[in-house]
Curated annotation (Swiss-Prot):
Its EC number is 7.1.1.-. This is NAD(P)H-quinone oxidoreductase subunit O. It comes from the Bacteria. It comes from Synechococcus elongatus (strain ATCC 33912 / PCC 7942 / FACHB-805) (Anacystis nidulans R2). The lineage of its organism: Bacteria, Bacillati, Cyanobacteriota, Cyanophyceae, Synechococcales. One of its GO terms (molecular function) is quinone binding.
Amino acid sequence: MAAALKKGSLVRAIAEQLQGSVELLASDGRIPSYVLETNGEILDIKGDYALVRFSRPTPNVWLRLDQLQSAA
């Protein structure tokens, strides 16, 4: 699924992939509900990571592509 993701894609985070990940541990270790309950938009892709903007007034976040799935 990650191969189909590109800039502008609407995505959802995969909870199982985020649990215990370095990306989550770099924060406070809890997944905010909006990350799992709302769609995000890929703003940029660098290697295996995507910069994602969620529909909340929060900073954009870098997540691995394998932690995301298409929202469509």
